[in-house]
Amino acid sequence: MLLLKNCLTIFFKNKNYVSWRFLEVNDRETWAEDYALDLDKYALEAYWLEAKEVKQDDASVLSCFVFKYQGWFFFFIYYYLFKTQAELDAEAKIDEELSDDEGNIDEDLEDFQNEAKVSTSLELF
């Protein structure tokens, strides 16, 4: 519960925390100008960690990252699952076609042998 509270505190109080934390932007002033951010309005992560007494640890940071980017996170999970399923379906289809071909080869061989027997028996008459 504390982990969720830390994550929500960081996320709602400073929405750029995750961006600053993970993109490791060194020149925050230039970055803020590019995205039209007011640095006074969005305090730096150190301020929020001290002022709000949010415990900084790897689990909190990771949970914030997943919480903020959960759409992409689940997209990649679903992409991986669907890709894996599609590959398995393709392999199953190929295996099925190969097994059908082996059956057809056996049937063709039997037909050829039967025709050979018939033709040799007709030649004898």
Swiss-Prot record:
State the compartments where it is located: Mitochondrion
User: Where on the tree of life does the source sit, at the highest rank?
Assistant: Eukaryota
Quote the protein name from its UniProt record: Uncharacterized mitochondrial protein ORF7
Write the record's keywords in alphabetical order, separated by commas.
Mitochondrion
One GO CC term on file: mitochondrion
